Amino acid sequence: DREGSLVIWTTTPWTIPANTFVAVDGEMTYQAVRAAQDGDSETLYIAEPCVKDVLKKGRYDDYEVVEEYTGEELVGWEYDHPLADRLAETADFAGAGEVYTAEYVEADRTGLVHSAPGHGQEDFARGKELGLETFVPVDGRGEFTGTAGDYAGTFVRDANDDIIADLDDVGALLASGTHDHRYGHCWRCDTDIIFLATDQWFITVTDIKDDLLDNIDDSEW
């Protein structure tokens, strides 16, 4: 068991209930930092290029680097979901709740990325590569299901503030703020898209094209 917290970041707090793994850059250097604030101290794991900026945002008074690791050395570390007490279920299956490498991690924010394969294309693809199940506590209406516990029945975007407040309440929020960035919107209704993995089926038409053409004359239109 290790003391401390993996400092992750996300622009979509509503996806945190679906967290399945934390992604790091395998070649990046990460530091275990003992950070002090108002007489108390805690150990935080942050990418080395991000340490000063992160601690500034967290309003820490002072810090010391306790140890350094490569991202590869963090792989396999297990962690507890910060909102487990608020949720009826979390991603609780083989491989979930661990650290993995991913190509989409960059040396910005904290260098550790919250990943929810049920709610993001890159996360989904990496989850499939890792053989992880896809955990989706959201229904087709964009509302949290009963598995989301305290947030059940809430439209996901309306839950952002509550999730941030709950993270703060359990002592798991380092900082929060607004951030301008590009995000997909529906071209019809001009609303931001909710990424949601769903069960679907597809037909490879090229495999049956000849049969389709042969049966045109026998079809009623």
Q: Which residues does each PLM region occupy?
A:
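Catalytic alpha/beta core of large soluble enzyme barrels
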Residues: 18-139, 221
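Residue patterns forming the tRNA-binding/recognition surfaces of aminoacyl-tRNA synthetases
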Residues: 1-17, 36-37, 76, 108-221
